[in-house]
Amino acid sequence: MTQLSSSDVPGMGRRQFMNLLTFGSVTGVALGALYPVANYFIPPKAAGSGGGTSAKDELGNPITASGWLSSHPEGDRSLVQGLKGDPTYLIVEGEDAIGSYGINAICTHLGCVVPWNSGANKFMCPCHGSQYDSTGKVVRGPAPLSLALANVSVENDNVFVSQWTETDFRTGDKPWWA
């Protein structure tokens, strides 16, 4: 076998170089644009030993039980970011107790966020008038189902929200959202 000298080896042409440069640039931009899309489909990491996600306030800061209880009176239902970032109501059951369940605030009719009406002691959807009692059970349509529930636990003063898989205590049925 004979070896070619450096003058006999064909160099990379300008066209081939520009094609490689363009391909590399387009590939880099495409991967950079697809990263957030792919990351959206990856569920958040579990926090706490209960396997839930940390409840967060409107700014995305983790909620502590002591801080929440000091600023929310008994019977209060206020929104936090729960599972999958869905708005979820935390319920204050006493001076020093957060309820063991949270209520997903997404209406089962068309997906509107349902506000708590403390004067009427129920959740009232502003979109089409669906109403839910204080536990999230549907009492007036057009919503076909009760609001979804989530387990709420407190570990080392941190509040965690996890998937509700037990029987729905409001209806006695298997949860429709699980």
Swiss-Prot record:
Subunit organization: The 4 large subunits of the cytochrome b6-f complex are cytochrome b6, subunit IV (17 kDa polypeptide, PetD), cytochrome f and the Rieske protein, while the 4 small subunits are PetG, PetL, PetM and PetN. The complex functions as a dimer.
Q: What is its main location?
A: membrane
Its UniProt entry gives the catalysed reaction(s) as: 2 oxidized [plastocyanin] + a plastoquinol + 2 H(+)(in) = 2 reduced [plastocyanin] + a plastoquinone + 4 H(+)(out)
Listed PANTHER family: CYTOCHROME B-C1 COMPLEX SUBUNIT RIESKE, MITOCHONDRIAL
Using the record's annotation, list all stretches that form the Rieske domain: 65-161
Record has Iron-sulfur as a keyword: yes
Q: Which InterPro entries match?
A: Cyt_b6_f_Rieske, Rieske_2Fe-2S, Rieske_2Fe-2S_sf, Rieske_Fe-S_prot, Rieske_Fe-S_prot_C, TAT_signal
Keyword annotations: 2Fe-2S, Disulfide bond, Electron transport, Iron, Iron-sulfur, Membrane, Metal-binding, Thylakoid, Translocase, Transmembrane, Transmembrane helix, Transport
Q: Which residues does [2Fe-2S] cluster bind?
A: C107, H109, C125, H128
Q: State one molecular function term (GO).
A: electron transporter, transferring electrons within cytochrome b6/f complex of photosystem II activity
User: Gene3D superfamilies, from UniProt?
Assistant: Rieske [2Fe-2S] iron-sulphur domain, Single helix bin
Q: Which organism is it from?
A: Synechococcus sp. (strain CC9605)
The record's listing under NCBIfam families reads: Cytb6fFeSPetC, PRK13474.1
**Phylogenetic lineage:** Bacteria, Bacillati, Cyanobacteriota, Cyanophyceae, Synechococcales
> What HAMAP family does this protein's entry cite?
Cytb6_f_Rieske (MF_01335)
Tell me the Gene Ontology biological-process terms attached to this UniProt entry: photosynthesis
EC number(s) per entry: 7.1.1.6
Q: Which gene encodes it?
A: petC
- The protein in question is named Cytochrome b6-f complex iron-sulfur subunit
